[in-house]
C-alpha cells in the first residue's frame, strides 16, 4: 500500500502568496523600466533632477537648435537686432550687477513709501518719455524701460498694474519683469532672465523665437497686473482684475525689476500701489510694493506759526522793491532819485497813511495798503532807474519837491483841517495813532513856516523832536498853501546860498 506524504495546506498558501507578490512587483518594475527607457531616449533629452526638468546642458543644446532655425527665417533687421542683443548679454551677463536693495534705498523706501519707485529711461536710446515717475510714453522704435528699484522679497506677494491709455493696433506692448542688466532695445521676455505678457495674447519667458499662447489680446483701456511670490519664485499675470495661470516657478534668487516695453507709439500708466488696484484680492491683502505713505512728514502749512513768510519781495507798477526785515514780517523799501529833490530833507519820508496802521500780519505775505498810495519807505539813491508811478508824484514839472504830500500843488486835499490841541506826549504824538498829522511845525511862525515830516523811528513807537528845536505847547498846523510856499522859499534860499558859495 502506497502512503502519501503529509499534506500541509497552511504552508502552501504562504508560498503561493509570496510568489504572487513578488511577481506583481516584478511586473510593475518592468513597466516603469519600459516607460523610463522610451521617455529618456526620445529627442535626446536627459533628466538630471528629481521632478523631470532637463539639465542646463540639454537646455543650451535645445536653444542652439531653435536659434539656428529662427535665424534662417529672420530678415536682416531682425537678425541684426538679435545678434546685437546676444553680444550685449555676452558682455553683460544677467545678475552681473549688484542689484540688492541697499541701506540708502531701504531708508528712501521707509521715508517715501511707494513713491520711491519710478521708471528710469535710458538716455542713450531716448525712445520713451517718463512723466510723473510712472507715466510712460513710447515712440516709434523698440524700447524697454525698467524701474529704479527691484521688487522686495519680505512679504508673501508683491503686485503692480499697468493701464494701457493709448495703443494703436500695430503696436506690440510687453509688460513683465526682468533682471539687470538687460538690453533695453529689446522687449521684456525675449532674453534671460525676463518674463512678459504681450499685447498679442502670448507670453514669453527667456524666449526670443517662439511665443506661447497665454490669454486674451490686450487693447486700449485694459489693465495688466503682474504678481510675484518671492518664497516660491512664482510670477503670474492678471487682466482687468482676473487672474491668469502662473507663468514660471522657482525664480527665488533673482532680483526682478518691473519692466515695460513697446515697439511703437503708446502710453502706459503704472500703479505700484499709490492707488487702488483693479485686482480686488491685491487691494484686500495690500500687495503693493510699499505703503502709500512713508514716514517722511509733509511740510507744515504756511502761516500756521508766527513769522512765516511766503513772499519777501515783489513788484508793483513795474518797480522792484528791496527788502528790509522787521520783527516777524517783511517790510518793503522803495527808492527814488535825487534828481530834482536836492532841497528835500533826507528825513522827509512818508511812513504811513492816515487811515492805515502797521500791525504784524495775521497771514503770510507783504502787508497791503487799502489805498493806492505807496506805504513803503523812500530811500534816496543816486541812480535808482525809472521811478514808479507813486514815486513820480513827488516831483512836479518844474522839479520842485512837494513837501505836503503826494498830490500836486494845484489840487489841495479836500477838507484839510487841523485837529484839536492836545498835550505833548499824548497819544496824538505816537506813530501808532490814526490822528497824528504828517506835517509838524518846528518853532516857526505861520508866515514863514517850515513843514517837516517826521519819519518813524526804528527804536521805538514815539517820535522825538530834533535837538535844538523849541516846540510850543500847542503848535499850529500849517495849511497846504503855506507848506507849498515854504518849500518854494527854501528852494530860493538854497539856490542863493549855493550861488554865494560859488562866487
Curated annotation (Swiss-Prot):
Isomerase as UniProt keyword: no
Topology class, membrane: Single-pass type II membrane protein
Positions of the B30.2/SPRY domain: 81-277
Segments on the Cytoplasmic side according to the record's topology features: 1-13
Main localization of the protein described in the UniProt heading: membrane
Biased composition annotated in UniProt, kind: Low complexity: 442-451
Domain of life: Eukaryota
Entry GO CC: endosome membrane; vacuolar membrane
Region annotation Disordered: where it falls in the sequence: 342-372, 398-503
Coiled-coil regions listed in the entry: none
Keyword set includes Nucleotide-binding: no
Compartments it resides in: Vacuole membrane; Endosome membrane
Comp. bias regions, Basic and acidic residues: 488-503
Transmembrane segments: 14-34
Positions in the Lumenal compartment: 35-503
Keywords recorded for this protein, A-Z: Endosome, Glycoprotein, Membrane, Protein transport, Signal-anchor, Transmembrane, Transmembrane helix, Transport, Vacuole
InterPro entries linked: B30.2/SPRY (IPR001870), B30.2/SPRY_sf (IPR043136), ConA-like_dom_sf (IPR013320), SPRY_dom (IPR003877), SPRY_Ssh4-like (IPR035780), Ubq-SigPath_Reg (IPR050618)
A biological process from GO: protein transport to vacuole involved in ubiquitin-dependent protein catabolic process via the multivesicular body sorting pathway
Positions glycosylated per UniProt: 200, 210, 349
Family: Belongs to the SSH4 family.
Function in brief: Components of the endosome-vacuole trafficking pathway that regulates nutrient transport. May be involved in processes which determine whether plasma membrane proteins are degraded or routed to the plasma membrane.
Protein name listed in UniProt: Protein ssh4
Classification of source organism: Eukaryota, Fungi, Dikarya, Ascomycota, Pezizomycotina
Amino acid at each position: 500500500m502506497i502512503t502519501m506524504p503529509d499534506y500541509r495546506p497552511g504552508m502552501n498558501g504562504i508560498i503561493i502568496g509570496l510568489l504572487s507578490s513578488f511577481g506583481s512587483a516584478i511586473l510593475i518594475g518592468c513597466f516603469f523600466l519600459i516607460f523610463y527607457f522610451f521617455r529618456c531616449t526620445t529627442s535626446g533629452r536627459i533628466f538630471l533632477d528629481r521632478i523631470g526638468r532637463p539639465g542646463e546642458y540639454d537646455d543650451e543644446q535645445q536653444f542652439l537648435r531653435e536659434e539656428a532655425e529662427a535665424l534662417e527665417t529672420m530678415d536682416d533687421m531682425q537678425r541684426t537686432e538679435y545678434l546685437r542683443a546676444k553680444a550685449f548679454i555676452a558682455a553683460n551677463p544677467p545678475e552681473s550687477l549688484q542689484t540688492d536693495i541697499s541701506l540708502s534705498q531701504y531708508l528712501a523706501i521707509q521715508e517715501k513709501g511707494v513713491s520711491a519707485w519710478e521708471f528710469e529711461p535710458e538716455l542713450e536710446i531716448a525712445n520713451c518719455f517718463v512723466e510723473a515717475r510712472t507715466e510712460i510714453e513710447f515712440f516709434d522704435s523698440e524700447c524697454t524701460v525698467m524701474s529704479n528699484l527691484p521688487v522686495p522679497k519680505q512679504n508673501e506677494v508683491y503686485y503692480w498694474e499697468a493701464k494701457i491709455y493709448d495703443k494703436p493696433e500695430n503696436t506690440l506692448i510687453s509688460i513683465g519683469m526682468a533682471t539687470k542688466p538687460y538690453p533695453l532695445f529689446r522687449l521684456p521676455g525675449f532674453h534671460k532672465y525676463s518674463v512678459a505678457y504681450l499685447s498679442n495674447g502670448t507670453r514669453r519667458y527667456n524666449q526670443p523665437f517662439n511665443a506661447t499662447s497665454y490669454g486674451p489680446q490686450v487693447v486700449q483701456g485694459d489693465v495688466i497686473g503682474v504678481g510675484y511670490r518671492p518664497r516660491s519664485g512664482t510670477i503670474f499675470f492678471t487682466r482687468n482684475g482676473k487672474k491668469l495661470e502662473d507663468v514660471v516657478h522657482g525664480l527665488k534668487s533673482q532680483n526682478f525689476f518691473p519692466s515695460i516695453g513697446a515697439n511703437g507709439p503708446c502710453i502706459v500708466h503704472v500703479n505700484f500701489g499709490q492707488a487702488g488696484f483693479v485686482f480686488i484680492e491685491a487691494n484686500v491683502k495690500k500687495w503693493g510694493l510699499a505703503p502709500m505713505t512713508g514716514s517722511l512728514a509733509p511740510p507744515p502749512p504756511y502761516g500756521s506759526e508766527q513769522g512765516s513768510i511766503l513772499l519777501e519781495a515783489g513788484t508793483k507798477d513795474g518797480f522792484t522793491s528791496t527788502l528790509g526785515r522787521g520783527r516777524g514780517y517783511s517790510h518793503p523799501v522803495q527808492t527814488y532819485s535825487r534828481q530834482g529833490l536836492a532841497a528835500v530833507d533826507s528825513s522827509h519820508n512818508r511812513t504811513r497813511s492816515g487811515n492805515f496802521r502797521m500791525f504784524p500780519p495775521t497771514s503770510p505775505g507783504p502787508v497791503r495798503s487799502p489805498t493806492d498810495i505807496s506805504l513803503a519807505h523812500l530811500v534816496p539813491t543816486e541812480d535808482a532807474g525809472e521811478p514808479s508811478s507813486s514815486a513820480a508824484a513827488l516831483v512836479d514839472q518844474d522839479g520842485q519837491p512837494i513837501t505836503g504830500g503826494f498830490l500836486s500843488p494845484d489840487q489841495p486835499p479836500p477838507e484839510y483841517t487841523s485837529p484839536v490841541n492836545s498835550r505833548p506826549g499824548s497819544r496824538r504824538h505816537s506813530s501808532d495813532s490814526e490822528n497824528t498829522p504828517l506835517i509838524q511845525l518846528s518853532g516857526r511862525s505861520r508866515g514863514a513856516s517850515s513843514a517837516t515830516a517826521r519819519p518813524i523811528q526804528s527804536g521805538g513807537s514815539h517820535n522825538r523832536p530834533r535837538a535844538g528845536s523849541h516846540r510850543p505847547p500847542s503848535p499850529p498846523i500849517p495849511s497846504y498853501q503855506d507848506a507849498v510856499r515854504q518849500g518854494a522859499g527854501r528852494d530860493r534860499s538854497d539856490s542863493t546860498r549855493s550861488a554865494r558859495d560859488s562866487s
